[in-house]
Amino acid sequence: MATEIAKHICCGIDCNNEADRLQCPKCLNDGVKSYFCGQECFRNSWNIHKHLHRPPNVEKREDGTYNPFPKFHFAGSLKPVYPLSPIRKVPPHIKRPDYAKTGVSRSEQIEGRSFKLKRLTPKEQEGMRKVCRLGREVLDAAAAAVRPGTTTDELDSIVHNACIERDCFPSTLNYYAFPKSVCTSVNEIICHGIPDQRPLEDGDIVNIDVSLYHNGFHGDLNETYYVGDKAKANPDLVCLVENTRIALDKAIAAVKPGVLFQEFGNIIEKHTNSITEKQISVVRTYCGHGINQLFHCSPSIPHYSHNKAPGIARPGMTFTIEPMLTLGPARDITWPDDWTSSTASGRCSAQFEHTLLVTETGCEVLTARLPNSPGGPLK
C-alpha cells in the first residue's frame, strides 16, 4: 500500500503553499526541517532564510543560542543572540505591498527617479488616518510587554500578530530582505535592530519601530521605552530619552504650510545644542521620509541643522519626523547583518517618530499617543 506524503507549509517568503519533498540542505545539516514548495520559492526566499543558518565554526551555547558574527568588533556590550525564529506568515487575504514576495519595491524605485511631493486627496487622507491609528494600537500592544526578561523576538511576535488581527501587513517584513515584522533597537543600537533571542535587562532602553500596511497605505511610528526601574533612575538615559522626545515635539510644532523641510533639522539640533548637562548629538545618517501608498518616498527630512533638503510643506502631504540622538558623538557603524546600526562609541541612542499630515493651518499627528498608551514622559 502506498503511503501519503505528509504535507507541510512552505517556508518561503509570503508563500502559504503546501510543500512535501524539497528541503533546505543547510537546514538538514543542522537538523532543522524547512520545506519549500519549489526551487523558485527557495531562491526568492534565500536572502531572509539564510539568517536562520548557523555560520560554520560558530559554537552554540548550552541554551542553543550563538553569536553569528564572533569576529566582528562590536562597539558596545550588545551582541546578537541567534538563532532567529522562523519567518512569520501573513494570511493570504491580507493586502500586500509590492515588495512582499521579492523584497524590492519597484514603485519606490520609480518614484525615486523623480522628486514628486504627493498631496493626498481627502479620501487618501482617511486611508492614512486609519492605518496610523492601527499602528498606534500595534505599538502600544508591544510596549505593554516591555519588561526585564522579555526577548525582542517576543516583541516581534506581538507586533506581527497584532498586525494580522487588524488585517495589516507588517511593512518591514522582507523589505529589502529585512527578516522580521518590527525593528527593535536596544541601548547603543540607533535603528533597524533585528529582533532576536536576547532578553531585555533592567537598565536597558529599547526602541520599537512599527510600520504597517493597510488597504494600500503605510503608517510608521516608534518610541523609546525604559526597561525596568534601573533605566528610569539612570540620569544619562533619562536626559537622552526625554530630550529626544522633546526635540521631536518641537519639530512637530513647526510643521505648517510653507515651512521648508530643512527647517526641522535646524529646530532639532538647536534643541540638542541647548542641553548643558550632557553631550548629545544628532545622527546624520538616517532621516525622516515621505509616506503614503509608498513606505519611503519624497521628501527626505534630515534631523540636523544646515541641511540642504529641498521642498516646502503643503497641505495634504504626509511624512515622518524621527530624530535619533546619541550620548556623545554621533558616528555610526553597521553590523554584518547589513541592517543593525550602532553608535561607534558604544554609548546609548534614542529615537521617537510620528507620521504627520500637513493641514491648512498646521499639522495632524496621525500616530499620536492615546490616553492609555504605555510609556510617555517621566513625571
Curated annotation (Swiss-Prot):
Cofactor: Zn(2+); Co(2+); Mn(2+); Fe(2+)
GO BP terms: protein processing
Gene Ontology terms, MF aspect: initiator methionyl aminopeptidase activity; metalloaminopeptidase activity; zinc ion binding
UniProt keyword annotation of Heme present: no
Cofactor note as given: Binds 2 divalent metal cations per subunit. Has a high-affinity and a low affinity metal-binding site. The true nature of the physiological cofactor is under debate. The enzyme is active with zinc, cobalt, manganese or divalent iron ions. Has high activity with zinc; zinc cofactor is transferred into the active site region by the zng1 zinc chaperone.
Reactions performed catalytically: Release of N-terminal amino acids, preferentially methionine, from peptides and arylamides
Main localization of the protein described in the UniProt heading: cytoplasm
Any Pfam family the entry gives: zf-C6H2
Residues annotated with Phosphoserine modification: S373
Keywords: Aminopeptidase, Cytoplasm, Hydrolase, Metal-binding, Nucleus, Phosphoprotein, Protease, Zinc, Zinc-finger
Residues annotated for Zn(2+) 2 binding in this entry: C24, C27, H49, H53
Entry-linked Gene3D superfamilies: Creatinase/methionine aminopeptidase superfamily (3.90.230.10)
S-S pairs: none
Binding-site list for Zn(2+) 3: D209, D220, E353
Keyword Protease annotated: yes
Enzyme class: hydrolase
EC number(s) reported in the record: 3.4.11.18
Residues that hold a protein according to the record: H192, H296
Binding site for Zn(2+) 1: C10, C15, C37, C41
Zn finger region (C6H2-type): 7-60
Family: Belongs to the peptidase M24A family. Methionine aminopeptidase type 1 subfamily.
Assembly with partners or alone: Associates with the 60S ribosomal subunit of the 80S translational complex.
Function per UniProt: Cotranslationally removes the N-terminal methionine from nascent proteins. The N-terminal methionine is often cleaved when the second residue in the primary sequence is small and uncharged (Met-Ala-, Cys, Gly, Pro, Ser, Thr, or Val).
Designated name of the protein: Methionine aminopeptidase 1
Taxonomic classification: Eukaryota, Fungi, Dikarya, Ascomycota, Taphrinomycotina
Gene name linked to the record: fma1
